Curated annotation (Swiss-Prot):
GO terms for molecular function: acylphosphatase activity. Its EC number is 3.6.1.7. It is an enzyme of class 3 (hydrolase). It catalyses: an acyl phosphate + H2O = a carboxylate + phosphate + H(+). The keyword Protein biosynthesis does not apply. The active site is at R22, N40. Residues 7-93 form the Acylphosphatase-like domain. This is Acylphosphatase. The gene is acyP. It comes from Cupriavidus metallidurans (strain ATCC 43123 / DSM 2839 / NBRC 102507 / CH34) (Ralstonia metallidurans). Keywords: Hydrolase.
Length: 95
C-alpha cells in the first residue's frame, strides 16, 4: 500500500506566541515524522507548513488545537498547499 504525501498550511490563532508553542509544535511534528516548518507571524498567529501522510497531518492539527499547557488556542485554520518535500521540521524567522 502506497502512502500519499500531502502538504498542509495551518494557522493557530489565540494566545500562541510567547508560550512555547513553536518549540512544542516542532517537537510534535518531528515525533510524527513530518517535514516542514513553523514560524510566528507578526499578526500574532503561528504558521505551520507540514508535509506527510494525511493521518499524521491530522494528528498534528488535533495537537495544534490544544497546544502546550500555557497556550490558549481559539482556532486552527487548515488549507491544502502545493506539495513539497522536506528533510526535517525547522523553525523559521517571524514573518
Amino acid at each position: 500500500m502506497t502512502t500519499t504525501t500531502e502538504t498542509w498550511q495551518l494557522f493557530a490563532h489565540g494566545r500562541v506566541q510567547g508560550v512555547g508553542y513553536r518549540a512544542a509544535c516542532a517537537d510534535r511534528a518531528t515525533s510524527l515524522g513530518l517535514g516542514g516548518w513553523v514560524r510566528n507571524r507578526v499578526d500574532g498567529r503561528v504558521e505551520v507548513l507540514a508535509s506527510g501522510p494525511r493521518e499524521r497531518l491530522e494528528a498534528l492539527r488535533v495537537w495544534m488545537e490544544a497546544g502546550p499547557p500555557a497556550a490558549q488556542v481559539s482556532k486552527v485554520e487548515v488549507a491544502q498547499a502545493a506539495p513539497q518535500l522536506f528533510d526535517r521540521f525547522d523553525w523559521l524567522p517571524t514573518a
